[in-house]
Amino acid sequence: ENRQIPLIKNIIQASDLKVQTGGGVRSVEDVEKLLHEGASRAVIGSLAVKDQDTTQTIFKKFGAECICLATDVLPQNGEYMIAVSGWQEGSAVTINDLIEGYLDVGLKHILCTDISRDGTLGGPNIDLYKTVKNDFADIQIQASGGVSSLDDLKVLNTDGIIIGKALYEDLFTVEQALEAAAC
């Protein structure tokens, strides 16, 4: 099991930025390692669906400020269904069910990806983020999937935005993105 902890540590040490990291987080010990190396927040995805007891233990041990739930969704029949295991498996859990399951342990942060739009440059799923924000006004939402333009950043009413392919394709710069998102 290669968790890339040394690489994550190097990234954290090379920057004054807060670093949120995840991928393959499956235990209390995994979260402990990430936070010990200086990550400000650990992202938990599949574990939150597959093992709610362990995930709640993580929230209680480290505090909600240090945990972000990855809510990777696929729109299906008017619902946003959670996908797990690197998007390889569907689940019977809706995004609302997942969020509601962690409110009692203080859930504050979600990274919400519409996986049908991720990497497509097809624009973000504005309705998804509006719905989640309306249903859970106190949750900090990081939007992910489909960002293709600076206009996308201006219309997303979320607390953070994940940008991938648009930067790789040089559609705009990080500086331009920060300026657009600040509007």
What are these regions, as identified by a protein language model?
Residues 33-54, 114-117, 145-149, 158-177:
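Glycine-rich phosphate-binding active-site loops on the catalytic face of alpha/beta enzymes
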Residues 2-9, 88-96, 122-130:
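Charged helix-capping and loop-helix junction motifs
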Residues 8-13, 35, 56-63, 103, ...:
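Surface-exposed amphipathic alpha-helices with a cationic face
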Residues 1, 77, 90, 117-122, ...:
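Short, small-residue-enriched loops and turns at beta-alpha junctions
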Residues 4-7, 11, 30, 51:
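Generic hydrophobic, aliphatic-rich segments that mediate packing or membrane embedding
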Residues 35, 39-117:
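Conserved anion-binding
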Residues 15, 19-20, 25-41, 127-161:
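Catalytic cores of alpha/beta
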Residues 55-58, 125, 153:
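Distinct, well-ordered alpha-helical segments
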